UniProtKB/Swiss-Prot annotation:
Disulfide bonds: none annotated. Part of the 50S ribosomal subunit. Forms a cluster with proteins L3 and L19. In the 70S ribosome, L14 and L19 interact and together make contacts with the 16S rRNA in bridges B5 and B8. GO terms for cellular component: cytosolic large ribosomal subunit. GO terms for biological process: translation. Belongs to the universal ribosomal protein uL14 family. PROSITE patterns: RIBOSOMAL_L14. Pfam families: Ribosomal_L14. It comes from Wolinella succinogenes (strain ATCC 29543 / DSM 1740 / CCUG 13145 / JCM 31913 / LMG 7466 / NCTC 11488 / FDC 602W). This is Large ribosomal subunit protein uL14. Binds to 23S rRNA. Forms part of two intersubunit bridges in the 70S ribosome. The keyword Protein transport does not apply.
Length: 122
């Protein structure tokens, strides 16, 4: 469950290390984002030679949350951290590698490039 001012680790090699959620996209009064949702975020920590710089405002898709997500079959899935993958204007990932597992909900949200780059889809 991601809301405004939530800090997330970045699960790709775009150069950013940590982002802070500014806004959850999808509806005017939408408060929370979960796995597979797109957010607008500000880069808080970044590598000096990365593609993404500190202070940049980016779009990102949430790939892991500490708060459990209930699946249609009744099972729950939760992760050890809150993580996101930074997107470009075409909703494709900026990085070329994804670190750590991603939730299956990312596939249902049609982010197939992220699913194919991920080492594990849970």
């Amino acid at each position: 469950m991601i809301q405004s001012f939530t800090r997330l680790t970045v699960a790709d090699n775009s150069g950013a290390k940590e982002v802070m959620c500014i806004k959850v996209l999808g509806g005017s009064k939408r408060r929370y984002a979960t796995v597979g949702d797109v957010i607008i975020a500000s880069v808080k920590k970044a590598l000096p030679n990365g593609k993404i710089k500190k202070g940049q405002v980016v779009k990102a898709v949430v790939v892991r949350t500490k708060k459990e997500v209930q699946r249609d079959n009744g099972s729950l899935i939760r992760f050890d951290d809150n993580a996101a993958v930074i997107l470009d204007n075409k909703r494709e990932p900026v990085g070329t590698r994804i670190f750590g597992p991603v939730g299956r909900e990312v596939r249902y949200a049609n982010f197939m490039k992220i699913v194919s780059l991920a080492p594990e889809v849970l």
